[in-house]
Design a protein with these regions (language model features):
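Non-catalytic accessory regions flanking glycosidase/transglycosidase catalytic cores in CAZymes
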Residues: 17-153, 186-206, 264, 319-494, ...
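Catalytic-core region of carbohydrate-active enzymes that cleave or remodel glycosidic bonds
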Residues: 239-334
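Flexible loop residues that form catalytic
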Residues: 49, 72, 159, 212, ...
Length: 813
């Protein structure tokens, strides 16, 4: 025993001595071209809820390659209907629809089927013929008449290896054993042939297993090869902690199985990828991008939480979060040449500890773009064989980063860490990246030397502090979250439910000045019913000075958001404390970042004439350009001079313009008219109400009645940008872990023309947000009417407009 203990101590000492000597490093070979970069990893399962939720601008910027969406009029979820959002899928190679989504509850008629099994009355073949195939017929006939049918993939069974429909029932449990497998195979053949009899060219995807398991895949492929029912698209899911390290093994094994049974290589779509704790965290998701680019697989992010934010890739309907920036930079690399990347890393199986990257060479061979993650210390990037590109010996290096700031924390721009000019020696360049955060991704660019580039070596970079490392007070405790968090094990602080419960944390700033303290928090529903969702009132104490802050409801504790406090702090050590006041909440981490006034806003060049501008708030911005003429902003048409002001909505604005331009914050305005709820004429069921926080709003407009009308006088004909301040907290359906939020819509009518405008759920009747839409108005008076058309209804339920507090009518420029 003594020898064993001594041996273990020696191992521990050796293990602990490794990190000190280890230098994380990544090598990019600019001469080793692997193929063309795609956006096949940019796919989503129920990521789009309704038309413009999320917005076309924020989705178009990502160049989505595939989606999995609900079958038309399906009952599985109240949103995600493929017909409602198909206009935002122009970039998609594949549009997958789950036919079983016609049924409500998870897993599709689970309780009904299990009750019949207990009674001994369930016959899977009878259920298939009498309940499922009539629905399949109805849906296929409808879908085959749609303009997107050539890209459509019918997923006829989803995760049927759970054995609910076809499994063998033994002693109260269902089993996907040999009997279950044969039942599924027969059902597959019946359904496959049935669809082909109606639509011979239909693409059918399957088997749709919940994971990749060699035996299950082999059996399925053997059966389909021998029975003339091989799917056109191979589908499985990757939802486990081993998905990333085993991704290539699964791919290679599947290709081996195809060859074994003489099947031509099929396109592969992993229609659900990512664990709950990974989705939304860019540091984790980059590993999936790398895996899919190497294997050529399409993938759709799993739906673990909400259906209205691209599976945690947007902060709301139109604002980026940190994960959006990862997928946007990935989209910018589409069409470029992928470069070989080799990593010197310590940990193969823990993604956050695995330094890795994705690199491309621009189409004109003069810029190397890299996205890297996996280190909480500075690391080296060795770019080799630049002499094989069109870069010369003088280059500009730019290093940016986005930190994970909560699932719904808005991140308006990456943080610029360094920018400098460098010399390439013998075709090689070494770059040191000041990595400090495992939950960040780093964007590194090597481009031709820019003589006008501002030299930046930021030493006062953002730093993260984990609340679980603070001093817990009262009954506060740490715990592991099922969702994305920062830090290591037990990365959340909860239990702050009564007076005295809280946490105290020390933090340090290197230099005196203004700082943003970004608090990543979660706020669940204390009441247990949707209408009980409310703010948490929290006592926050910074260096002994107390104030009460309000943390908005995030539906679930671990659906984290961001609350930002700006403080003037002297250099040195500081303390921040949080204590319960009213309502429960949880804390993840705090990112301390030097404040920089956002004078110029980011403008991303997408093509010759298309740009994406990221505005921090709704309002007017100064446009500076060497060009003047016609402009389109999110489809609203107008014209501008080379020095002008334009109205932008908060978040992403898709702009078409004939020249390059810059945008700056400005206080000036063009035409802008605000209409308050109390100034609007109501009729029918519509009501004017005031909530406990003093907000006056219009409510109870539905497809069963209620109308709001107001007049606005505008100076000229044209497209106007209408920004509405609203709240929406509706919910429908039931699911074990997804919150089935409903996106309310209002029908806006002017000049005899109507449009249905969807508004994203704000997760509380007391949380008001803005959304902006376009309205064509005529010079002079315009009567605008707000109703609800009833054009979109879930399960024939009454459809409502959102709570409306105010609207502003804004000229484009």
């Amino acid at each position: 025993m003594t020898k064993i203990i001594g041996f273990l101590i020696t191992l521990i000492i050796l293990f602990e001595s490794v990190p000190a000597a280890f230098q994380p490093a990544l090598t990019v070979d600019a001469s080793d071209i692997l193929g063309e970069s795609t956006t096949r990893a940019t796919g989503f399962l129920y990521g789009l809820a309704e038309k413009e939720v999320p917005s076309s601008a924020i989705t178009n910027a990502l160049k989505i390659s595939s989606v999995s969406q609900k079958v038309p009029d399906g009952l599985q979820h109240p949103t995600g209907d493929i017909d409602h959002i198909q206009g935002q899928l122009e970039s998609c190679d594949y549009i997958v629809t789950y036919l079983q989504d016609s049924f409500d509850t998870w897993y599709y008629c689970h309780k009904e089927i299990m009750d019949m099994r207990v009674e001994g009355t369930y016959d899977w073949k009878e259920f298939l013929y009498e309940r499922y195939l009539p629905i399949v017929e109805e849906k296929v006939k409808h879908l085959e008449a749609q303009p997107y049918k050539d890209r459509l993939v019918y997923c006829i069974f989803n995760e049927c290896d759970n054995a609910i429909w076809f499994g063998n029932y033994i002693d109260g449990n269902v089993h996907y054993d040999e009997t279950g497998r044969q039942n599924f195979y027969e059902a597959w053949k019946i359904t496959y042939d049935f669809i082909k009899s109606m639509a011979p060219d239909a693409k059918i995807g399957g088997p749709g297993f919940c994971d990749y398991e060699t035996g299950k895949i082999t059996g399925f492929m053997q059966y389909t090869a021998e029975n003339n029912c091989v799917p056109e698209i191979m589908i499985w899911h990757e939802l486990a902690y081993w998905s990333i390290p085993d991704w290539h093994l699964h791919y290679e094994d599947y290709r081996r199985i195809e060859k074994e049974y003489g099947i031509a290589e099929l396109p592969i779509i992993v229609t659900e990828y990512g664990e709950p704790e990974e989705c939304g965290n860019p540091a984790a998701m980059l590993h999936y991008i790398i895996a899919m680019e190497k294997t050529g697989i399409w993938g759709n992010m799993a739906y673990w939480r909400l259906s209205n934010n691209l599976n945690d890739t947007t902060a709301d309907d139109n604002s980026p979060n940190s994960n959006w920036w990862l997928y946007r930079r990935y989209a910018e690399m589409k069409g470029q040449q992928r470069l070989a990347v080799n990593s010197k890393t310590q940990n193969k199986y823990e993604p956050k500890d695995r330094l890795d990257g994705f690199a491309t060479l621009s189409e004109n061979s003069d810029t190397v773009n890299m996205i890297i993650t996996g280190s909480d210390k500075s690391f080296n990037v060795k770019v080799r064989n630049l002499s094989d590109t069109l870069l010369n010996d003088n280059v500009t290096v730019k290093i940016e980063t986005v930190y994970y700031e909560g699932l719904t924390g808005i991140v308006s721009a990456p943080t610029l860490l360094r920018q400098y000019n460098a010399k390439v020696a013998s075709g090689n360049l070494n770059i040191t990246v000041p990595g400090t955060d495992k939950d960040a991704v780093y964007f590194v660019t090597v481009s031709p030397k820019d003589e006008n580039a501002q030299i930046i070596r930021n030493t006062n970079i953002p730093k993260r502090y984990e609340f679980e490392n603070g001093r817990l007070k009262g009954d506060a405790y740490t715990y592991d979250s099922w969702y994305a968090t920062t830090g290591e094990l037990k990365g959340m602080v909860g239990g702050m439910e009564k007076d005295g419960d809280g946490v105290k944390l020390n933090f340090t700033v290197k230099k005196g000045g203004l700082y943003n303290l970004h608090i990543i928090f979660g706020k669940h529903n204390d009441s247990g019913v949707p209408h009980g969702r409310d703010y948490a009132k929290v006592r926050m104490i910074i260096d002994g000075k107390e104030e009460i802050i309000s943390l908005e409801n995030t539906v679930k504790s671990e659906c984290t958001s961001k609350f930002t406090v700006m403080k003037s702090l002297p250099a040195g050590i500081h303390t921040i404390e949080f204590y319960n006041c009213e309502g429960t909440y949880v804390l993840d981490s705090m990112l301390v970042s030097p404040y920089e006034a956002p004078i110029e806003i980011p403008v991303l060049n997408d093509s010759d004439n298309r740009y994406y501008a990221i505005a921090p708030h709704d309002g007017y911005y100064s446009l500076l350009s060497n060009h003047s003429g016609e402009i389109s902003i999110d489809g609203a048409l107008g014209s501008v001079e080379n020095l002008d002001i334009v109205y932008l909505r908060r978040g992403v604005n898709e702009i078409t313009f004939g020249g390059e331009f810059r945008l700056f914050a400005v206080t000036a305005k063009a035409f802008s008219k605000t209409i308050k709820a109390e100034d609007i004429t109501l009729s029918g069921k519509a009501q004017l109400l005031t909530d406990k926080y003093g907000v006056t709003y219009i409510d109870n407009i539905s497809d069963l009645g209620g109308k709001a009308e107001f007049n606005v006088n505008v100076p000229s004909d044209g497209d106007y940008r209408v920004t509405v301040l609203y709240a929406n907290n509706s919910e429908g359906g039931y699911h074990d872990y997804n919150v089935d939020l409903i996106e309310r819509y209002m029908t806006v009518t002017v000049g005899g023309k109507s449009q249905d405008v969807f508004t994203r759920n704000t997760c509380s009747n007391f949380t008001y947000k803005t959304m902006t839409f376009n309205l064509s108005l005529s010079e002079g008076d315009n009567l605008i009417t707000l109703t609800n058309s009833g054009n979109y209804k879930f399960h024939n339920r009454e459809a409502f407009a959102p709570q409306i507090a105010e609207l502003t009518i804004n000229s484009l420029s």
